[in-house]
Design a protein with these regions (language model features):
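RNA pseudouridine synthases
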Residues: 1-150
Length: 150
């Protein structure tokens, strides 16, 4: 479909865009001067009014929805908040997962601040994720992950 500021454009709708965020790029600028390069700053070089509807972590690649205006941002954000948008991730896990599918249901909390790391913690927020094996390789299992909460 093309590119916008070097970012692959997957879908162009009158109210929003869907772009392919590469791994290693922030979704939005960070606090330090060295963290100003981001998906949204690159996109806004060509389209000033664009706004992120959601974010992906720096190390995560994938599709990101970007609203074209404030009204679209409000409407799309409401869909995400109501969990009307399904998220699906493909992840490589070190080791062999014994079962073919399952549900991970553990509360998560921030374990470290810099860099921010999250993990299971009894005082964390509820987090429930469905998973299913996609492929096995030596020492690695590829999983489909579908977060339901968290």
């Amino acid at each position: 479909m093309g590119e916008l500021s070097g970012i692959p454009l997957v879908l162009a709708h009158p109210r929003f865009l869907v772009v392919q965020k590469p791994a290693g790029l922030l979704s939005q600028p960070g606090l330090g001067a060295h963290q100003q390069d981001s998906l949204i700053t690159r996109l806004q070089r060509e389209c000033k009014g664009l706004r992120l509807v959601h974010r992906l972590d720096r190390d995560t690649s994938g599709l990101v929805v970007v609203a074209r205006d404030q009204d679209s941002l409000r409407d799309l954000s409401a869909l995400f908040a109501a969990r009307r948008v399904q998220k699906l991730y493909l992840a490589d896990v070190v080791g062999t997962v014994g079962k073919h599918q399952g549900c991970q249901d553990q509360p998560l909390a921030r374990l470290e601040r810099h860099p921010p790391r999250y993990g299971p913690h009894p005082d964390g927020k509820p987090c429930r994720t469905l998973w299913r094996q996609h492929a096995r390789m030596p020492g690695l299992t590829r999983l489909w992950l579908r977060p339901l909460t968290g």
